[in-house]
Amino acid sequence: MGRFIFVSFGLLVVFLSLSGTGADQDCLPDWSSHERHCYKVINEYKTWEEAEQYCTEEANGGHLVSFHNRQEVAFVVKLGYTILKADVVWIGLRDFWRECQWEWSNGAKLNYKGWSDEPNCFIAYTVGNRWVRRKCSSTHPFVCKSPA
């Protein structure tokens, strides 16, 4: 009886210590959870296309990161700067048909904006929350996002 109580108490402690850490978000190892999504900062320099392909192969439903509110931007910017110490990362925003019809690589609507005018793919500064268009053939680190 004493062992049963000890084991039960131990399991309760483990459960309580994991709750609220994102462990229950079903993110892959080395991914961080935020608002029912998983994020991974990749410290490899790739073109936009290569980065998007990496993200889609890395996780089920994965794409370059898309932003839908300021809190998500703040989370990713902090995560990116902490890991990379770099000032820019690819994000999933692109003018796919070169007609100024901006889309996220995961097909989501563009409902949050923050950029200046330039080419057809976007980077985000990890300091200052600014988006800038860059040539899709340039290389940068990037952030992947997938559903939890």
Swiss-Prot record:
One of its GO terms (cellular component) is extracellular region. Residues 34-145 form the C-type lectin domain. SMART domains: CLECT. Expressed by the venom gland. Disulfide bonds join C27-C38, C55-C144, C121-C136. Its main location: secreted. InterPro entries: C-type_lectin-like, C-type_lectin-like/link_sf, C-type_lectin/snaclec_domain, C-type_lectin_CS, CTDL_fold. It holds the Pfam family Lectin_C. PROSITE patterns: C_TYPE_LECTIN_1, C_TYPE_LECTIN_2. It is found in: Secreted. One of its GO terms (molecular function) is toxin activity. Keywords: Disulfide bond, Hemostasis impairing toxin, Secreted, Signal, Toxin. Residues 1-23 form the signal peptide. Belongs to the snaclec family. Shows greater sequence similarity to the beta than alpha subunits compared to other heterodimer snaclecs. Interferes with one step of hemostasis (modulation of platelet aggregation, or coagulation cascade, for example). Heterodimer; disulfide-linked. This is Snaclec 7.
